[in-house]
Amino acid sequence: MKSPLYISSRAILFALCSGCLLLTSSLVFSQNEAPPYLDARYRHWADSVISTLSLDERIAQLIMIPAYSNKDQVHIDSISQLVKKHGVGGIIFFQGGPVRQATMTNQLQKISKVPLMISLDGEWGLKMRLDSTVRFPYQMALGAIEDENLLYEMGEEIAWQFRRTGVHVNFAPVVDINNNANNPVIGFRSFGEDKENVTRKSMAYMKGMQDHGVLASAKHFPGHGDTDVDSHYGLPVLHFSKKRLQEIELYPFRKLMEAGLGSVMVAHMNIPALDSTLNLASTLSHPIVTGLLKEEMGYEGLVFTDALNMQAVAKFYPPGVLDAKALLAGNDILLNTMDVPAAIREIKAALERHEITQEVIDEKVLKVLKAKAWMGLDHWKPIKTDNLIADLNRPKARYLSRKLTSASLTLLRNENDLLPVKGLENIKIATLSLGAADTTAFQKGLSRYGKMSHFFFPKEGGIQELQDLKQKLSDFQLVLVGIHGLGIRAGTNQFGITPEMNVLIRELTESHSLVVSVFGNVYSLAEIQGLDKVQGLIAAYQETPLTQDLVSQIIFGGIGAEGRLPVQVSSYFKKGNGLKTDGGFRMAYTDPEAIGIATDNLSGIDSLVHLAIREKAIPGAQVLVAKDGKVFYHKAFGHHTYDSLKAVDLEDLYDLASITKISTSLAAFMHLKGKGQFDEGETLGTYLSMARGTNKENLIYSDILTHQARLQSWIPFWKSTVRKSGKFKWYTMKSDSSRRFPIRVAQDLFIHRKYDQKIYKEILESPLNPEPGYVYSDLSFILAPKVVEEITGVPFFRYLDKNIYTPIGANNLTFNPYQHYPMSEIVPSELDELFRKQLLQGTVHDEGAAMLGGISGHAGLFGTANDLAKLMHLYLYDGLYAGQQLIAAGVISTYSKCQFCDKGNYRGMGFDRPNKPGDPNGNAAASAPETSFGHSGFTGTYTWIDPVNGLVYVFLSNRVYPTRENRKLYQLNIRTEVLEQVYQALNHPLRIKDK
């Protein structure tokens, strides 16, 4: 799933050397690369601006004030006043939205004498502060990733988003080494506890941003990772020697500075080894900011204070005095100044007292102005708010978030190679969400892979609920547990793990195979009892719909596990732990970009389906497309009916119509072929005793399956049950079920128990077509269940379910879904006004199949696009799926070939194939290769397999609603045109720089 990256020439060198970055950094960057804005070319504009500024205005350039785009006009006016009257140098934005912030930024920039430096805390991207944006993983999750190139790519994308939103500084990365599991403020915000790993990740993130025009800011100097006090609320004290600080905490700062780090944020901590002044925060310490950072470490870039409204400093000094002390300590930019006039006044007073010189102030101002020039503020342009949210949510960003998240997920236990889960036919699976009261995204993701029952245990669950749950789970062998709603910070009551949860996990490990997925702070693993005995354990680091989706895919083998623990959680779960698994075991679910297609290049699919709905060709549809086992397009459109009362869901079942032929009859025949129990060279009479002595006895199956056995196309069996008056003949149908009329044809309609024999007799006694040649026929497929049952002694559907559907997890492929599913989950077909006189929902549309009780080999199967795609992947991979060769190798590839092309019959055995080249009424997409195959269905369904390109395509609709006379779907050629859109997208792959 890894895609090539677009990176600059400098970044290419970075990528090549990332593995040896810290040992041979001179191969990647010069040992003393200066911050980018210190280049001489930015001096001219800075000099021209500073010459126009008064002393007050120069001091104000060193002040950055907080602003919120989600507050009222009073707040906006107050910020505007500070910009216009006092000329503050910058804004740090907090909570809000992209458009509101961009609009506010434009307003403020227009009234500012000097363009404003705009900043934001975006450790995991804009989402840290702004709604309606893409969320990237927490840094702790990123620390689990082995490929630093992904972090460079993230830095590049975040830089693009920041610049698109008019933001110039990202207060990231956090380079604190989190070697204290109880740290209440850093924790999940750190890349981990290993200084080399933290440095590699920070370097990649920093370079990705700065190579693309956004200033990085390493924080929190000199290292906030081993504290147990949150500096937002108090002053942490760091009791370490300077030697220890040099070896550990300062290490990543030093390495990033050597590589051109743009800025540093100084933390609020008391560090006696560096400055013994009582209750003095490092932010206010001249020995730390000037002595250590600037002089000893030689740092020349911008130095930001941490927010000056934090209690670690604010409770000791009033506004103004605090700002002056921070500037005197050596900081360049005062962040979150709470009283701008007081700050300017106190700094001027310090100047008058000769505690600071004009030269030092001017030096700081020039540095700020040069940085602004590097940021492009020397030619500022308003932010365009049109399409801003769409731009920030571009597919490239979403796919990058997926790649990062996937690479971070860490498999910590996999006893007996349990994962990916194998042999679905042999186990009964339950899912259990702890800390949740409703179906989670994790459970929904798991459900894509097979049949399972969902259970919940909320945080408030007690002993009685626990015992009840254990009883319900007693029938299951495998329980897939997700732990949800965890606290993200240390010290939050065991992260939300309750005693009852621990009891439940401990006791379940004694009676079940257990796979536990922890969606939260990785340190919470230490609070969960019994994890050393579970069969599978996955650390997900955070709880988002995406993490839950991807973890479900690891469990069933859609994707592999790659991550490694970036911290030591306990003596059992150590830093560096992480087991690998391979993906591709079952279908994966991903974005088009994963297979080299731009999402936007598939917009034609949406347009075609919407056209079909608008033209009333169909009320709705499910569409799925996969390449090489990766489902990259899976959408539901429209509604069950034109009244728009029920929207189509991806879990809804459609009547598959004639796709039943290749999904049931052909599946069984090919399975039996592999076992040596069926051969297409034999005759119908060989396998079906009732055919012997009839004109069908000697029909050869290779002719039958290619529709050239001279069988009639179809027989309207239902007409034999109806009188001229329109009423049913008394011996055929009844409105109530009984011993004689037990077979349900539709709601309140039951057929005689022996009527199937009449149907079979009518088929066997029907005349053969007088001339040889291709005539598409249902008749042999109606007989197919009897053939399979006679060969195997097993009922038709039971045979399919046991040998095909359950092993591949296609449990939604079923006959008579009304027996198993709510009607709201079954899409209706036709409003039948001739035969059944009702809306058909949950019973098969085809009359003949309905008269056989809904189970037939030519029609009757229902399913979702997802489950049908599993079967089509089995066919794509020549009978191999989820590690099992369910159909003998070579059988499907043989059956799907053109059997009688020399006779003008282009069909495979059972499968449809592209018509003769040049046929204007083709049954396949124009670009589909000759070797592709599939089938269509009368109700508006279609599926196609392309072995050359590794494609599986499924289109499900109910075009027969409300009447089968609606032929617009055919006339518009929607089904094959949708597939053609895929081919066109494949022919226009992503450029490397677009990935």
Positions of the model-derived regions?
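Preference for extracellular/luminal or secreted protein segments
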Residues: 30-65, 69-82, 295, 317-594, ...
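Second-shell residues forming the walls of enzyme active-site clefts
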Residues: 54, 91, 100-116, 126-128, ...
